[in-house]
Design a protein with these regions (language model features):
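The substrate-binding groove and active-site-proximal loops of carbohydrate-active enzymes
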Residues: 11-28, 51-61, 84-100, 115-127, ...
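Surface-exposed loop and adjacent secondary-structure segments within mature catalytic domains
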Residues: 69-79, 129-184
Length: 836
């Protein structure tokens, strides 16, 4: 049987990377102009894949609007293939909802141009999450084409079935030699073309499961090769033993599907780095970018969209266009070169502007919600709406920032008086809040005493006692188990001779810790919260020496401030650490020696929980990159021996390390000065141009937030607390209160362990969309409860299109029975009346 050799013409377009956006955009305009010219005169130049992302169309047409019809014509013809993404994202550093919105937007734009390429194309993403098959199937994509994170060889073939934990499957096609395995085929004449095709095809045959070979004719920012059809015809006439032809990814996958029964099954994350680096240091490069991204995702997903739904159901217009504009700015920052922090300094400065735009739009939209609930009136009586973004009833802290704090008390929705604690410019209290709902509080002027008790060394509540040590670390006694965790929150600093892509220790790696510092401490105790304040300096080497093999002798003091907070009725210790970074070429982490011995860590992932073994990965000198013990996380990481456990939650700090002995390290900061370097200890080849990036040293003041959660049993006994820490109540300032607004309301309620990830208006109708997932391995039978009667409930896919004929007429009931299979992501479309 003949081999079919598919040559796929494409380009990989990094929107911004070693040059800023506008320069790469100028090149993009030239490239697409060239492409359209070739397609207009060369009928045999059949296909060109525009990198799986649609933002390039927007970028191009902003400069060349006159080319819109010609571009649309070539896309409709199937000669230019676009989508399914808006941008090619990093997967681990963005939320699951961000990935879904990315695909929704890519689908919308593609449909405007007449055609969507249904290929799960991720040519250069730095590893892949285990739930990607389920996400892709939610968009009717049954395949995945990728490069990094997998090593194809004689045993592990380049085509396989990739299965998510819920059972969703896609046909995965690995590109063993990259998305550039056949670039510049024609630039030196036919003889070189002939030699390259034969060499590359013969090499790939040893990895293939089917009789199909994929030659990717393109690379970063390359133009189409006009002579390609001519050379293909000459080659085919000369070598009839194989079939060489101009193809595309859709045609290639159609051929592979014919042999689907022969493909082996693989489950889990794709993070192998034997042949292709996954560049694991990107998890902590330019940490300020990660923190900004997380804040913007939380703003849109947890506050703006659900509160806009709430006001929409009360009669306000849903601001779809503005919400989508905010999402576009956010998604533009989630390219793998952007969110990873691996570009030149100019790029990341421009990213901060886009994050600012997201926050400006988000806060404006929340202000619009507040104005609507206030009836656009003001009065001396000040009302505050406090919203709970979690789908269960919480008891948690509420913070209200206010200028004038003299003689203030609160009245809750039932008329109960609350005397909050006052810390600096904040009112702080603890209260219960309804699921996906709110309470209205009223500010009242009343004489009150400001009582703030002090002692030197400890704070406690019903669950935990926290004692501060001389070095600023803490011991936590869990009153429920009687177990004490000692010396938690030790700072550990070491040299970093790497670059924006990889941590790499210098040959002589001086480690500095806070174990022996003498800290200044004091405590404050209120009715609802007690705090320990810690101050010390960390004496750190200024930078690496010129040989980059050791840290400098000269040292500078870097001030550290830590605030430990313990709230009444809440079994966790919230930590805010402020670090003034005055030095370069280093990595700063915090250590939590829990003493819990385990062979695995459980980690919050995308729409679920990832189980990772705690054993050193085996490797040898043939590996292109050394596997690192640092791994990605979303909201939390947990160690448990089955009887007790310790969870560490975080806000926008995606890198951790866990050991079998029970140590957890959380990376706070990684300071480097180069986009890429060669000859690293941890990576054999350079990952990009060797360019200095002084702003990646991250000098200045940094603020980190994380929470310590001792618990009984496994992660399921603590993850609600972690999510409450990350997704805290949102306070909206009202003037007067609109007459028909209830003072307390739960819009929807869904019992844990199910987790709601999205509450928004439908993309195509006036209905409401709610998305949730089952993070456990058991089937859950429960009910979704609604404050407003439901008329119809329909299960839809991630595109918000019906999965099957499953419309349920609710006859204005307020609850719907659900049976949710293990690890499933479920999206429901709800038809409901407006609130009168």
């Amino acid at each position: 049987m003949k081999w079919k050799i598919h040559i796929v013409s494409h380009t990989h377009w990094d929107r911004e990377w070693y040059l800023p956006f506008q320069i790469f955009r100028a090149r993009l305009v030239k490239m697409i102009d060239s492409l359209l010219n070739i397609l207009s005169k060369e009928a045999d130049f059949r296909y060109f894949t525009l990198d799986g992302q649609t933002i390039v169309l927007e970028d191009y047409l902003e400069i060349r609007p006159d080319k819109a019809e010609e571009l649309k014509k070539r896309i409709k013809e199937g000669r230019i293939l676009i989508g399914p993404w808006y941008i090619l994202p990093d997967e681990f550093l963005v939320s699951g909802e961000s990935l879904i919105r990315n695909l929704i937007l890519g689908e919308k734009i593609s449909r405007k141009f007449g055609r969507v390429m249904r290929i799960g194309y991720m040519p250069d993403t730095f590893g892949h999450i285990e739930e990607m098959p389920q996400i892709l199937r939610g968009f009717e994509i049954d395949n995945f084409v990728f490069w990094r994170g997998y090593t194809a060889d004689e045993k592990r073939r380049s085509e396989f079935i990739w299965r998510a934990k819920d059972g969703s499957e896609v046909i995965a096609v690995n590109l063993p030699d990259g998305y550039f395995n056949a670039y510049n085929l024609t630039i030196n004449g036919f003889e070189e073309f002939e030699r390259k095709v034969k060499e590359k095809a013969d090499r790939l045959k040893s990895y293939a499961t089917t009789k199909n070979i994929l030659l990717m004719n393109g690379e970063d920012h390359l133009f189409p090769e006009e002579k390609l059809p001519e050379y293909i015809n000459i080659y085919q006439n000369k070598h009839p033993e194989d079939t060489l032809f101009h193809s595309n990814l859709e045609i290639f996958l159609k051929e592979v599907r014919k042999n689907k029964s022969e493909l082996e099954i693989f489950s889990g994350e794709l993070r192998d780095c034997k042949r292709t680096p996954i560049l694991s240091g990107v998890l902590s490069t330019r940490i300020y970018i990660k923190q900004k991204n997380e804040r913007c995702e939380v703003l849109l997903e947890k506050y703006v969209e659900p509160l806009s739904v709430l006001s929409y159901l009360f009669g306000m217009e849903y601001p779809s266009y503005l919400i989508w504009q905010a999402w576009k700015y956010l998604l533009q920052n989630q390219t793998h070169d952007g969110i990873c922090g691996t570009s030149v300094d100019e790029v990341h400065r421009e990213m901060l502007t886009r994050y600012a735009w997201v926050e400006e739009l988000g806060e404006y939209l929340l202000e619009e919600v507040a104005n609507y609930f206030a009836g656009n009136k003001t009065s001396q009586d000040k009302f505050y709406l406090v919203y709970n973004p979690n789908n269960w009833k919480i008891v948690d802290r509420i913070e209200l920032i206010k200028k004038d704090l003299r003689d203030i008390t609160l009245e809750d929705s039932k008329g109960r008086e609350i005397v909050p604690d006052i810390f600096e410019n904040k009112l702080i209290w603890v209260d219960s809040l309804p699921p996906l709902g709110y309470k209205i509080y009223r500010i009242k002027k009343k004489k009150r005493e400001r009582i703030m008790r002090r002692n030197n060394r400890w704070i406690e509540n019903e669950f935990l006692k926290v004692m501060v040590n001389e070095n600023g670390s803490i011991d936590i006694e869990d009153k429920r188990s009687g177990i004490t965790y000692n010396n938690l929150n030790i700072l550990v600093d070491e040299g970093d001779a790497g670059d924006e892509y990889n941590y790499s220790p210098p040959e002589k790696n001086l480690q500095v810790t806070s174990k022996k510092v003498r800290a200044r401490t004091f405590t404050k105790h209120g009715e609802y919260v007690s705090k320990i304040f810690v101050f010390f300096d960390l004496l750190l080497p200024l930078k690496l020496r010129k040989n980059r093999k050791e840290r400098s002798k000269r040292k500078l003091r870097c001030p550290v401030e830590i605030e430990y907070s313990l709230y009444r009725g809440i079994p966790r210790v919230d930590v805010t650490l402020t670090f003034f970074n005055r030095v370069k070429d280093h990595r700063l982490r915090v250590l939590f020696p829990t003493g819990i011995k385990s062979d695995k860590a459980m980690v919050a992932g995308h729409f679920g929980v990832v189980e990772r073994e705690l054993k050193e990965e085996k490797w040898d000198d043939s590996w292109i990159e050394i596997p690192q013990p640092t791994k990605p996380q979303k909201e939390w990481v947990d160690l448990s021996d089955g009887k007790i456990g310790f969870m560490l939650a975080n806000k926008g700090l995606p890198e951790y390390e866990a050991t079998p002995e029970g140590d957890i390290y959380l990376t706070l900061l990684r300071s480097v000065g180069w986009l890429s370097r060669d000859a690293l200890v941890t990576r054999k080849i350079k990952a990009g141009p060797i360019i200095q990036t002084p702003e990646a040293q991250c000098l200045g003041t940094h603020r980190f937030q994380y929470s310590l959660i001792p618990h009984p049993g496994d992660w399921k006994n603590a993850f609600l607390q972690a999510r409450q820490f990350v997704y805290q109540p949102k306070v909206l300032k009202l003037g007067e209160l609109r007459k028909n607004v209830p003072k307390e309301l739960s819009l929807f309620s869904l019992a844990p362990p199910l987790v709601v990830s999205s509450l928004k208006k439908s993309e195509s109708s006036k209905d409401i969309v709610i998305r949730f997932y089952n993070p456990t391995g058991r089937t859950i039978e429960t009910e979704l409860e609604s404050f407003i009667p439901l008329e119809e409930v329909e299960m839809v896919n991630l595109k918000e299109e019906p999965i099957r004929n499953n419309m349920c007429n609710m006859e204005e009931r307020k609850n719907v029975g659900l049976k949710i299979e293990p690890y499933k992501i479920v999206t429901l479309k709800l038809k409901m009346k407006k609130w009168n």
